[in-house]
């Protein structure tokens, strides 16, 4: 659809802008620093379906390894890049107000790699405010499905409830902001992000049931890094 093409074009432009900022900071002060560590947090998930599927938020977990490289300080802005290797749970939980007795939960497990521009403002030792933005790719590894007995009295939709993931490669854009406390004992980060998938996990041709099946995830996480 034209709307999706426009959204994808805007997303690509934002990614290019986010990565261009550090690359144009060559006239800044050299501040090379490499840090590694780990992260963990929660996902608040939903899935964008077309046709629409009534649902409520589904909570999952995320966590993994983080590496960050700081390259420049451009005026008051610290510029760098961050990459992560995470386990992350996505999916959806159906809720129909007309039939509240029905329960269907699908949890989908991924290995994800966010590639982020890191832009920060603040003190070398103290508190910094930072912004992250960039592309994210993911690989589907497994899922679980929970369907209660109330469905025995209703006809379910096989294309919605019984179909396996068809596109195991997931990609999209992610971004967010947070605070970092830099100490001699290490760096502690608290962050909120949003992930918007540009890919569908079901096939979406004209003959398929869904024309859209994409993840949307609010992420809250804590990260610890040491130099």
Label every model-predicted segment.
Residues 47-54, 89-109, 141-169, 201-220:
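Flexible, solvent-exposed loop segments that connect beta-strands
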Residues 42-46, 87-91, 112, 121, ...:
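Transmembrane beta-strands of outer-membrane beta-barrel pores
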Residues 32-34, 57-61, 107-113, 127, ...:
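Residues that define the transmembrane beta-barrel architecture of outer-membrane proteins
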Residues 26-33, 72-79, 122-128, 182-187:
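Short loop/turn motifs that connect adjacent beta-strands in outer-membrane beta-barrel proteins
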Residues 25-68, 227:
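Short glycine/proline- and aromatic-enriched beta-strand/turn motifs that initiate or cap beta-hairpins
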Residues 31, 90, 170-227:
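Predominantly the C-terminal beta-signal and adjacent terminal strand-loop region
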Residues 1-31, 39, 222-227:
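Bacterial Sec-dependent N-terminal signal peptides
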Residues 34-40, 77-83, 111-113, 129-137, ...:
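Transmembrane beta-strands of outer-membrane beta-barrel proteins
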């Amino acid at each position: 659809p034209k709307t999706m093409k426009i959204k994808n074009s805007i997303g690509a432009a934002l990614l290019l802008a986010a990565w261009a900022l550090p690359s144009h900071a060559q006239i800044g002060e050299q501040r090379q620093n490499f840090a590694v560590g780990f992260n963990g947090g929660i996902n608040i998930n939903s899935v964008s379906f077309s046709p629409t599927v009534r649902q409520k938020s589904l909570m999952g977990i995320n966590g993994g390894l983080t590496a960050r490289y700081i390259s420049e300080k451009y005026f008051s802005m610290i510029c760098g890049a961050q990459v992560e290797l995470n386990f992350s749970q996505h999916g959806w939980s159906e809720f129909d107000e007309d039939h509240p007795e029905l329960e269907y939960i699908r949890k989908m497990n991924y290995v994800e790699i966010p590639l982020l521009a890191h832009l920060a403002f603040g003190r070398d030792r103290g508190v910094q405010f930072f912004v992250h933005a960039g592309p994210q790719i993911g690989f589907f590894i497994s899922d679980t499905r929970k369907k209660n007995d109330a469905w025995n009295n209703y006809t379910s939709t096989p294309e919605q409830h019984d179909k396996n993931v068809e596109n195991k490669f997931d990609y999209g854009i992610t971004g967010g902001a947070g605070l970092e406390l830099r100490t001699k004992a290490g760096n502690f980060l608290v962050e909120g992000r949003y992930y918007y998938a540009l890919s569908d996990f079901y096939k979406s041709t004209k003959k398929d049931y869904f024309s859209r099946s994409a993840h949307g995830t609010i992420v809250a996480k804590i990260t610890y890094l040491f130099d």
